[in-house]
Swiss-Prot record:
GO terms for molecular function: structural constituent of ribosome. It comes from Blochmanniella floridana. Pfam families: Ribosomal_L27. The lineage of its organism: Bacteria, Pseudomonadati, Pseudomonadota, Gammaproteobacteria, Enterobacterales. HAMAP family: Ribosomal_bL27. This is Large ribosomal subunit protein bL27. Residues 1-21 are annotated as: Disordered. GO terms for biological process: translation. Belongs to the bacterial ribosomal protein bL27 family. NCBIfam families: L27 (TIGR00062). One of its GO terms (cellular component) is cytosolic large ribosomal subunit.
Amino acid sequence: MAHKKAGGSTRNGRDSRGKRLGVKHFGGEIISAGTIIVRQRGNKFHPGKYVGCGRDHTLFALQSGKLLFEKKGKLQRRLVSIIVE
C-alpha cells in the first residue's frame, strides 16, 4: 500500500527564448547602408533622417554615415538619424 498520495502534475515549467532585442549600434559609430541599428517591439526609438523602419519596427540605415541619437519635439521622442559624411 502506498504511504504517500500521488503528487499532481504542474502545468508550468515553460518559457520562451530571448528575442535579442535592443540597440545594435551606438551614437557616433560609422555605419553602412542596410545595417540594423535597433531591434524593438513598438516604436521605442523613432526613425529620423536616412533611417528606415521595418514591419517589426526594426530601424535600419538607408545611407552610410555617422549615427546620431537625439530627443526631439514636445514629446521628447528618441530619434535615430544618420549624418551623411
